[in-house]
């Protein structure tokens, strides 16, 4: 017997089975997936940083 993992859709909170049956996981639908993408694109969501913005002078792609 296999255990079924269920997560909540990050957009609407609906339960989503984590497996092949849910192609948009962790989202419940393409709609919720696109809503989330739109929030990231509009910079409504961001990853928190503990870095100091004044250290940005040291950020360089040149080594």
UniProtKB/Swiss-Prot annotation:
Positions contributing to Zn(2+) binding: 9, 12, 28, 32
A Pfam match: YacG
Domain of life: Bacteria
A Gene Ontology biological process term: regulation of DNA-templated transcription
Entry note: cofactor: Binds 1 zinc ion.
Family recorded in the similarity comment: Belongs to the DNA gyrase inhibitor YacG family.
Subunit description: Interacts with GyrB.
Name this protein carries in UniProt: DNA gyrase inhibitor YacG
Lineage: Bacteria, Pseudomonadati, Pseudomonadota, Gammaproteobacteria, Enterobacterales
């Amino acid at each position: 017997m296999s255990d079924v993992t269920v997560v909540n859709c990050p957009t609407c909170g609906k339960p989503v089975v984590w497996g092949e049956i849910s192609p948009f996981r962790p989202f419940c639908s393409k709609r919720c997936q696109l809503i989330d993408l739109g929030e990231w694109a509009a910079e409504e969501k961001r990853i928190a940083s503990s870095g100091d913005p004044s250290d940005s002078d040291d950020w360089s792609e040149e080594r």
